[in-house]
Amino acid sequence: MATWNRPHPRLPVAPEPVAEGESQQPLGRELSEANRFAYAALCGISLSQLFPEPEQSSFCSEFVTGLVKWLHLSETVLPTMMAFASGLGGKGDDIFAQTLLKDPILKDNPSAISQDLLSFSLKDGHYDARARVLVCHVISLLQVPMEELDILEEVFLESLKDAKEEESETAEESRKRKEKRRKWKRYLLIGLATVGGGTVIGVTGGLAAPLVAAGAATIIGSAGAAALGSVAGIAVMTSLFGAAGAGLTGYKMKKRVGAIEEFMFLPLTDGKQLHITIAITGWLGSGRYRTFNAPWMALARSQEQYCLAWEAKYLMELGNALETILSGLANMVAQEALKYTVLSGIVAALTLPASLLSVANVIDNPWGVCLHRSAEVGKHLAHILLSRQQGRRPVTLIGFSLGARVIYFCLQEMAQEQDCQGIIEDVVLLGAPVEGDPKYWEPFRNVVSGRIINGYCRGDWLLSFVYRTSSVQLRVAGLQPVLLQDRRMENVDLSSVVNGHLDYAKKMDVILKAVGIRTKPGWSEKGLPLAPGGLPQEEPLQPATVSTDETIHQDEQKQGPAPGDSLKSAIPSSASQAQVPAGLDQSTEDSLPAAAAPAEGHLVCSHGVGPNPLGCPDCTRETQESCAELD
């Protein structure tokens, strides 16, 4: 829905400050009546397209009703707008968007609609995830860069901070930028004040209300500042950012909850934002990957980001087991790969190499323990989010391996509650050891407002091995697409990026870019910060394949992907990459024998996956279905 990697966004054009004594009203009301109608109709039709589920109908109706009043439209147009929100308006959103762009006010500054719609969405002190998804959709129709929404949200926060930024010595450009921001602060706050002296909505969180009100007096006048310092204003700020503004950093598990021994949020950034991101690590390794925040150093989804610290002792045991099994079996697996190239049918029938089964006890116990605990942690996370510990603002969840499993069970738990809507904006599950059957993902449509991203790798033999030794599930989301028929569902084939399960931690920067999540500039593909001008000289990676549910469904009906198919496995160009467990450390990979690289011309299965010790996941599923007696 949003494109995050855009260079140097421009600041929105700031309107001239309103002179003292002049009437102040939201920008939307300054449009002509016809364009106010087009504005409301655009939002109504967009809501029907984004949230057609019956469970979302009340939100759509309330949003449209409030918007009609916000724009001072006649009540006679309300039935028409309700019809649009119910899906009776067809797909005419682009027509209304083009009509708006012809308005004299918006012709040179289409981002003004973003400001007005954001002001309306925040007027009650709540920032519903569905409202943010709608704002993103509308500004994309108006061809406004998504970065401008981030700037607008940032300006809303800055507008109520009583902090005077010092001008740098290089300064003219910085000074002009700040002047533009000051103009926007004042203009945006007009939209946050109700005509007639109603409550002004503050969105700072964690700041003393009287101090904030004092700083705001110079921007919005003494009357508005008095309202901001009132009990109602403080209540709204608390609602948006959580109790006492502490948010997630203020949460600590006071006592053991069920089987959970450790659960806390660690800040990845120092900033505040109107939407937050929570990253969840799947295991703890050795060296630089022994901390929870190590894989997420390049993440830049929002200015307020956290990582979840959970069950460190058990995740460390799991990480050690993963590294042990990989380093100890490197030579054996490489040789087994050659042996089973021709006998892939036997392997697909779950007749695993005896040498693999002999070391299963190394990984089975810590893996089984973490499988259970990740489910409990996910349920606990769901209750925290449902209690609005983070405040009333959108949340994005990103996790890999067992961290993705935490997200899966969090969504599953939230889906059972009636008030689960409007909290989660996007979720990203990478290499998830969870059920891939779409019937298990269907309830998530009621929880997630934006995107449900499933990043998978068909050749992840380690995930195939460890998960199938502890579960009878044959369709694993981390190994293949989830065929959920919904606009939210996005499947991203990471086979060209992820060579082994441990790559999810080691190549997180590249993976985030592949799934469309913004990252910090100046980070190498291995997750290491780069010195200026120190870009690594590497061969470009093949782009990961992004597929929608419709494309996948068509592909499933074929015998195998043809060269021109829209969905195809992004397998490495070198056959050796499909053979050698690439999750190994570099030192281990260098010591692999020459036999690890199979000869050219080995057969590739009908699903496009080269031979590996466990065979193709799809082949395994097909064979297992025909041999149900095998366990």
Curated annotation (Swiss-Prot):
Keywords: Coiled coil, Membrane, Transmembrane, Transmembrane helix. This is Transmembrane and coiled-coil domain-containing protein 4. It holds the Pfam family DUF726. Residues 153-183 form a coiled coil. Residues 571-590 have a biased composition (Polar residues). The keyword Membrane applies. The chain crosses the membrane at residues 187-203, 204-220, 228-248, 343-363. Residues 1-26, 523-631 are annotated as: Disordered. It is found in: Membrane. One of its GO terms (cellular component) is membrane. It is a multi-pass membrane protein. Belongs to the TMCO4 family. It comes from Rattus norvegicus (Rat). InterPro entries: AB_hydrolase_fold, DUF726.
